[in-house]
């Protein structure tokens, strides 16, 4: 059972604490903005670009404050034999797959946040994850 309020609070606390650890960089707390589940691009810009950059290459404004550099999301297909790892990306977004590179879970687990945002509408959560994954797939280098 997901506990969205507790997880959401933990994610916000994590974001705030990142600023404290990065002495030169201050991360301002921003509440999660509700976006359209139909737009993978809108979700990426609002939820992912702060760390991964608008181009998905890992150079977002909060990247320097992280212990481990954010992944370059434009080479996921390249690293997977030329095929975009749709299932793996979905698992990461839902929180089903752990990321060793993220160490202490610096990357928010979006599944529970999407669940809270959609007020428990499983179809909307799945739509968000599918459309965000499709947008990340569109960023892949050729």
Model-derived features: positions:
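Electrostatic cytochrome c docking/interface patches
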Residues: 22-43, 81
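Sequence/structural segment immediately N-terminal to covalent heme-attachment motifs in c-type
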Residues: 34-57, 89
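C-terminal capping alpha-helices of c-type cytochrome domains
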Residues: 91-92, 103-142
